[in-house]
Each structure stands twice: as C-alpha cells, then as structure tokens.
Amino acid sequence: MRLDWCRHLALGALSMICFTPSLAASDLQKDTSLGLAPQDADLYMASYRCREQWEQFLQSKAVREIHQLDYVQKIVAKFKAQWESADGQLAQAKTVLKTPLAQDLIKLATEMASEEMFLFSDGKASQFLVGVNALNEELVEATGDGPEAILEWFESLTREDLNQVPIPTFVLGFKFQDEDRALNLLDQLQAVVSLGLNSNPATVQFAEAFQRVEDARGTRLVLNLHASMLPWDVWEAGSDSKELIQHWEQLLEGRKAAITFGILDKYLILAMSEDAKQLTKLGKQGGSLAQHADLKPVMADPSKPLTGVAYVSDRFAEAEYAAQYQNYFSKIYRQLAPSLALITEEGEIPEFLEALESDLEWLDDEVDQLMPDFKGSLSFSYSTKTGSEGWLFDRTESQWFDGSKRLDILDHVGSNPIMVSAMRRQPGTDWLTLARKVMRKAKGYLEAYLNSDELEEEDAEELAIVMKKGWPLLNRFADVIEQKMAPATRDGQSALVIAAGSLESKQWVKDMPPASSPLPLPEMAMVTGLSDKDLYVQGCAEIYSILDGVVDLVRELNPEAIPEGYSIPRPERKTSGGSEVFLYPIPEDCPVPKDMAPQVMVDARWAIASYSAKQSAELMKMSSSMNAKLQYKDRNLAGASYVDLGAFFKFAKPWLRYAIEMDKGDINTPLSDASDEIPAPTGKDVLDFIQALGSLGKVWATTELDGTGTKTHWRFEE
C-alpha cells in the first residue's frame, strides 16, 4: 500500500525550505529557471531569493536567542581573535583569501547563493530509469543462474538494448549578476584545465575534446566525451575476455556525452547532456515548464511571493515506481535463489520451495492490480508575514485517504495539544482479502517444510506443535481483524495526540535517583473513530483470548518460560461520564502520578487509548480549538496535522538537566576538556541552547482530495 502521508511530509519539508519574499508568478517564465527548463522536464527543483531566505532564518526568534547565548558569543569572539592574530597554516589561508582570484571566487559564490538555484532534467530521465531497470531485471535473473549465465547475458546485449538507455540532460544552475567576473574566472579555469590535460600523454585526447563555446547566450567550457576515448586496447591486453570487450566496444561505438560549465543567459550552469548543443535549445524550442498544465496552481495567484517549486512528472513517478516496487517479490526471489540452493547438499532449490517463484509472481500480480497508476507531484511555497505556507499536489489516486466527509475527530484532540496527526482512511478490504490468501499459501509452505527432510527431529516436533496450535490462533486473529475490528472502525478516523498535560514526577522508577525538580512526561493518546462500539469491545476481548492461547503455546514449547497458570491480565472495567474505561491501575508502590494508568476509554463514537485519565476525559469532550488553528472552515478533509516544534524542546530541558546533574553533579561544570580553539561548554550552556530552541515555531497542515489525487496545504509560523 502506498504511504501517501509519508510522501506528503517529505515533499512538504522540501518546499518549506523556501519561505522568503520573492517573485510574482506572472514573471516566472521570464525571470526564473522555470522559463529555462523544458516543458517535458521530468524533475525540477528551485529555490528563489536565497539570500533573503537566509536573512529571514537569521532573524527568526530561535536563531536570535542562540546568537545571544554567552557560549556562542565566546566562540565568535574566540574565532575573531584567532583570525586577527592568525599564524601558520591559518595565516597562509588568510593570505590566499585576500588574493584577487580568491576574492572574485568569493564574490561569485556569494552571488550564486544570493539569488536563485535550481536543478532540472529533461524528459529523458524517465526513459533512462525505465531502460536501466529493464536491463537490471535481466541481469538479476541471469545472476540466479550462475557466472556463465551472467557472461552470456553481457554477450547477448545489442545496440538496440543500449539505445533504450538514453543519456538525459541534467542542469544545475545559479543566477548571478557580474558577467565580467564570471568570464574572468572561466578564462582562468580553461587555462588550468588545458594545462593539466596537455601535461600528461594519457589525457591529451581529453585536452583535444575540451572546448570553449561562445554564442549569443554566453560562454561555456565543454568536455566532449566519446566511447572511443575509453582504453579498449589496454583492457583487451589485460583480459581473458577479449571477445566480450570487443563486443562492448562495438556496442558503445558512437555513444557520447558532454559536460558543460559556464554561462547560459543569466545563469552559471553545470550540465551533463548527450550533446552540448542541446543546452542552447533550452527555453527556446518546445516550450518551457512554466507553460505546462501541471504548473497551473503555481501560476494561479501572481500576487503571492513565490519562494520555491519542486516538480516530478507523471512519467518519472511511474518509472520510479516500476524500478523500485514492480515485481518486487519475484525480484527478491531471484536475488536470493542462489542462497536458497545452498540449503540442500545437491545445490538445488529444496523441493518444498519449487513453487515459490511462481507464487511470488502471483503475489506481484495481485499487488499490481491493487496499486493505482502512479503520477507525479508539484509542491511550492510562499512567504507570509508570520512565516511561510505552501501546497503539495500529489496527482496519484489515493488508496489510503478518504476525504468524503468532515474530519470530526479534530473535535476530540484536546484544547491545547503540542502535536496532532489525524486522518480518515479508506476501508482497505481488498488488502485484507489478499492478506488471507497469502496466509493460506504460507501455511502450505510451512506444512511442506515440516514434511521435508530438511528439519531435525526436535525442530520438526516443535514446528508440528506450532502448526497444530499456533496457526489456528493466527487464523482467529485474522478473523477478529476482518470480522470485528475492521467493521467496528469502519468510520476510518484516527488521530495521534500528544499534549503537555500535568504528568510530572521527581522519580519515575523506584530505582531512579530523585530529581531536584519535577520531570514532565507528555501525555500521548490514540483516538479511533467507532462505527460499532459493542463489536469493538468484543474484538478486543477476543484478542485477549488469543493472547492467552499464545501464552499456552509458548509454555508448551518451553515450560520454564512462563509459570503454570499464568494468563494475560484483564483490565479493570469502570464507567466515567457515560463512557466505559478499561484500565490497568498503577501499583501503590510505584512513584508515578496516580492519575496515570494505561487505559482505553470507549463511548458510542470514540475509543481513546492513553495512559492519562485526565487526557482521556478531555479528548472525549468536544473542543473546537484545533478547528480554529487549522482554519479549514468545516471543509471535508482527508488528513490534518499540527506540531508545536518548540514545545518538544521545552519538555526535553528538565530531562537533560537531570542527566547532566546525575553525570556531573552541577550544571556549571564543563562537559568536556577545553581546547585552545574552542572553550568547553558547561551543562548550563547546553540547557540555554535547548531553551532557545523552545522558540521554534508551529506547523499546521491539511490534506483534501483533489480530483483523484490529494492537495496538502501547510503553514509555518513562529
């Protein structure tokens, strides 16, 4: 099953790096690399106005507080003093940095890091991935048949096979201002590289392929590489496989690539392509990525200050899925087949595993039928007065999220959580059905293994007991999930909630030395939406019964492992405010707060698993505070999340103080030995740093269904 939520978090984090005042969207094609990237680009990532991003980061509250710390000020002062009185190697470095060449390099690097930076590929990147994956699958299959099969595979390759692996164009670029400075540095780079290549007979041919290109779009240095430049004669002389080397020399004849560095319009680029001439077509022929229909959300509001864009094409997303996950299980089998053959003395796959390859191919087909057609994504971000915001459009049909209804579980995440991750999932019955099919096939293999000659007598006896008594328990558990827990939670809503709460103690474990001040513990709960409370309670009770069976099975296999008569303890059952509570009371001699007890609180609509009675009671009540924070105005949501980043550091500080006091006795004691370069930090210095991180901001995100895909909107505020 596709992990949509993880992908949203990853791409959302990528777009969050860009959150400063930037360009109007109407100027994107003219003023940014979106006008340079081809319309068929497979990948595009860009960050705009980088200097302002850095300046805004430095002006954030947490960074300002860190900069003002005594220890940081000491380090800064120490560095300045060392720099001013530099001697030895540091003095030499200081002298080098003052040379005109070094100054020009520093100024150019500053320009490159101040404006715009980007990376994109053309449409051949997906073709390259598809071609490499196809060849890799053939190679893996040949690997399973031994070294001779691998050699035969290499010998069987044709030019048509290699033509399926084109060389894509990748361009890494930076916007700059001073063209004269850049040209001067290109001149010096050309001179140094040419001198180095011509000074060695082995690299003279590379010197001849190293060229300077000047046209209306700029000046660039190009290294043209050809397959003929490879040392075929040397390889033939030192190899026993001359025919294979000659075969590959013929296969690669005419293949070429170019590495380009220099100026293209207002950008300094480093590019790899099949032909350097392809770069001159960028932004001029075939349209630009800014004109692509997938980029319409970026262009929709020209008044917002755009700060970053990340784009993946449908072709590349499909190729990436095929390369990583298509035929996943049969690929693993082919890789492991040689090892499986070592199980028997004859060096062949054991008889009970002969059908494994075909069954794994069946499993691949079943999974493939359940998976959606993978498509690409688009994320982009803007700056705001209080931080930043952005969107992620994932065009792949979601088989996990259900956004058809209001996400009313957000009314039951408390009044002031420090973290919430809520969603509504689809039933997923097709996956449960497939899991049962896999279980039946797995049982067949275990039974065949039991009846084979591969097991020692004692091991066979234990496996026979497991199959006789353990497998029915597994079947019962699957029945409970499919027939009780899944229908009982068909509502599909769930939420992980972490709150500050009131749980604190100077001593959390009896053997733990008491702390000088209370140590807080965040309250954590899992809230689950119920469609049938009675069925849910019955399912939980059945799971306890199954666990008792597991205890009996373990005791039979190893009588000394579990005492006779022991069974899984059942929770106490109470009522509280119209809800039923199933809990395990904390023992009287345990030093933790007495209102702390592992429990599940259940009413007709919700099940709340927690270890805090106060949190369970609060979450069972309705609260609209999260709705106000998310600002989603009762829209139908598939998911929502909220994190107070600084709050986690505030919780960590007392525990870190306790650890330092236990180790050093006093927070003012240095934590390490001082050196001439860096003063040793004390425990207080570390605690002050953690205190500053407590000023980090908050992140909100909501996910909605958008056609067949999903749309996630996130906000970051200090």
Predicted regions and their residues:
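Bacterial N-terminal signal peptides that target proteins for export
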Residues: M1-A10
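Bacterial N-terminal signal peptides
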Residues: A10-T20
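One face of beta-strands
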Residues: A41-M45, F170-F174, T219-L221, I269-M272, ...
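Charged, amphipathic alpha-helical scaffolding segments
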Residues: V140-L151, R159-P168, L172, L252-L282, ...
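Short Gly/Thr-rich strand-loop-strand
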Residues: Q177-I259, K296-V309, L519, V537-Q599, ...
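A conserved glycine-rich beta-strand in the N-terminal activation segment of trypsin-fold
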Residues: E249-S339, L407, P591-P681
